Amino acid sequence: MLNYNHNQIEKKWQDYWDENKTFKTNDNLGQKKFYALDMFPYPSGAGLHVGHPEGYTATDIISRYKRMQGYNVLHPMGWDAFGLPAEQYALDTGNDPREFTKKNIQTFKRQIKELGFSYDWDREVNTTDPEYYKWTQWIFIQLYNKGLAYVDEVAVNWCPALGTVLSNEEVIDGVSERGGHPVYRKPMKQWVLKITEYADQLLADLDDLDWPESLKDMQRNWIGRSEGAKVSFDVDNTEGKVEVFTTRPDTIYGASFLVLSPEHALVNSITTDEYKEKVKAYQTEASKKSDLERTDLAKDKSGVFTGAYATNPLSGEKVQIWIADYVLSTYGTGAIMAVPAHDDRDYEFAKKFDLPIIEVIEGGNVEEAAYTGEGKHINSGELDGLENEAAITKAIQLLEQKGAGEKKVNYKLRDWLFSRQRYWGEPIPVIHWEDGTMTTVPEEELPLLLPETDEIKPSGTGESPLANIDSFVNVVDEKTGMKGRRETNTMPQWAGSCWYYLRYIDPKNENMLADPEKLKHWLPVDLYIGGVEHAVLHLLYARFWHKVLYDLAIVPTKEPFQKLFNQGMILGEGNEKMSKSKGNVINPDDIVQSHGADTLRLYEMFMGPLDAAIAWSEKGLDGSRRFLDRVWRLMVNEDGTLSSKIVTTNNKSLDKVYNQTVKKVTEDFETLGFNTAISQLMVFINECYKVDEVYKPYIEGFVKMLAPIAPHIGEELWSKLGHEESITYQPWPTYDEALLVDDEVEIVVQVNGKLRAKIKIAKDTSKEEMQEIALSNDNVKASIEGKDIMKVIAVPQKLVNIVAK
């Protein structure tokens, strides 16, 4: 059996594409455009795994397909190369993260090139390249000038043993993931970006995007907009006020106590001497827990009384003020009014600590449980007898009259904590002067370079390792002689990935982020494919920066990514997640070696729908390779010449299946239905094997449809068909509607209602001809022998019924 040599063919065409810069994107600003984007990878030490190429193959198929349709296609690749793993490696080994990162990028790039993706490598970006992060810093300065970047005291995860601040992901059950050391919440000065200012726009503009609804919902929930009221409770015997946000101001007559977060600014000043020790001990315990642990619905409620009281602004009743860790300082105002009769969590708390439960909505039995349903208000003064909506409106009115509250919209979304106490990130371009002022680094001095250092180690104070580098930190103003200290925090890994899709449009521009004309031509991104794990943060942060740049008239669109698609996860053979510990990780290098890149690409697209989670299967991989071998054998003789089966005359036998194939593959490519497109290509090849001759233009059309999926074999077969130039820019095949249907139909012939024959006839056969054909059929003749024909009924294209006695 003759099979093709994938190693030889794939290397040959990859070299050809490289030498000829086949996929170089020109900036023909008048041509119709298509921008296909992959989520660029973090170049880890482990290299590419088989999950990466799934999304990359999908965008590559679309890019190749669109080029053949005459589009100007932008399809770039780059590296999201700052981040913790490289820093961790540097801390563990003493090596420079630059070296580590450079080596990893080389591996990733080699692996990606071996898969035959049609990237324009002249547009490659790397977030750790000073020429790139110059513009990341420039965007930060624009945010700062617009009042969207500010310094705030924020509680962070401080790990004294490691001498550093950890992200929430690095803390598990109150200890560090690495080494298992205790972690405490400690307030530190941090840079924060005011994403909340854009909350409404980020919410509203989701409606115009072609994104999966489930993903839009994740963003909506993360933003978490709710309407309600802000209510003030005066604290007895002090000037203090406790402000709460509630979506149910109508239940205020049932507010029988207040709960503050242990970190709330008022706690220490209102706590009475008698309760000070208990409160202090509780605060310390709470500082060891993550937000997730604190808000776990299943956990036992804990809390302590502060000894202080406040006054309910509508009922005038005195209410106790407690602290409890299930209230977070970061949500709302960091305080809640507890209405135990109508809220499950408050009910549990009130029962545990024997606090009053006042029913204000009828319909439940508050002796047994909180009632959270609808109903008429009772025990509520002027609100009595009103239903929910009317009562909410009235309650806000009453609060406003007393100056004790107002209507308010609240967001679950918090401002974005933007500093990291790390070395391997973009330096934040800010100087703190000794007179207490701060300024940004002048734009003409950007990029502010990350200093090279022999020793990356935690500062021990919670600051970043940059704090140890005096030559970086200390500055003197040349004009005034004033001393200053540079900001030592660095930006999070999200920063570089917030805008990389803009830099691809004009990656070598030294004077601006990108040329406005080019931005106008290429934006928005037409198709963005990546994993669902970035559904919230990366996409929300990128949308936020894009909206700021839109307001600054730097980008011409309100949204960056018009259509977004999440590929599914490729699981191990036993339907488990691939992981090093399970030893079920599959390295694409091995597959490329054994089966070829085209087989890997075809298989990953054929496994199932692009967004489904599917288990890897060696059998499936072998099946994909067998299909490519069948295609090869159909067209190529043992000696490598073109098969004589391929002819220049059309005997029409493949008209229907060819035209159906072009229609189906074209429609499926448009909807990313690659698995069903491949099935149809297989149907076509099966039909080709059943006939003696195959019409050459049909085979050429087939090769054009196969090439985006399996580009190396596509190019090789195209050249075997006698073409000198690459298949890349050949026009996409078209189909003829008229040939999608058969010229022939099958009719049934019945004698006295019993089936006697099935006969193929031309579609336009007349009734008379149908009768003649039926009566001359041997089976029919045998069954009417010796009988009189009473009548013959013919239904065109369907049946002939003969009644005989």
From Swiss-Prot:
Xref: Gene3D superfamilies: 3.10.20.590, HUPs, Isoleucyl-tRNA Synthetase, Domain 1
Motif window: 'HIGH' region: 41-52
PANTHER family documented for this protein: LEUCINE--TRNA LIGASE, MITOCHONDRIAL (PTHR43740:SF2), LEUCYL-TRNA SYNTHETASE (PTHR43740)
Renumbered ranges of motif 'KMSKS' region: 577-581
Annotated keywords: Aminoacyl-tRNA synthetase, ATP-binding, Cytoplasm, Ligase, Nucleotide-binding, Protein biosynthesis
GO cellular component: cytosol
Organism phylogeny: Bacteria, Bacillati, Bacillota, Bacilli, Bacillales
Family label: Belongs to the class-I aminoacyl-tRNA synthetase family.
GO biological process, one term: leucyl-tRNA aminoacylation
Molecular-function GO terms, alphabetical: aminoacyl-tRNA deacylase activity; ATP binding; leucine-tRNA ligase activity
Main location as per UniProt: cytoplasm
Keyword Coiled coil: no
Protein known as: Leucine--tRNA ligase
HAMAP family: Leu_tRNA_synth_B (MF_00049_B)
Top-rank lineage group of the source organism: Bacteria
InterPro entries, sorted: aa-tRNA-synth_I_CS, aa-tRNA-synth_Ia, Leu-tRNA-ligase, Leu_tRNA-synth_edit, M/V/L/I-tRNA-synth_anticd-bd, Methionyl/Leucyl_tRNA_Synth, Rossmann-like_a/b/a_fold, tRNAsynth_Ia_anticodon-bd
Reactions performed catalytically: tRNA(Leu) + L-leucine + ATP = L-leucyl-tRNA(Leu) + AMP + diphosphate
Residue numbers binding ATP: 580
E.C. designation(s): 6.1.1.4
Compartment(s) where it occurs, according to its Swiss-Prot or TrEMBL record: Cytoplasm
Gene: leuS
Regions that span the bilayer: none
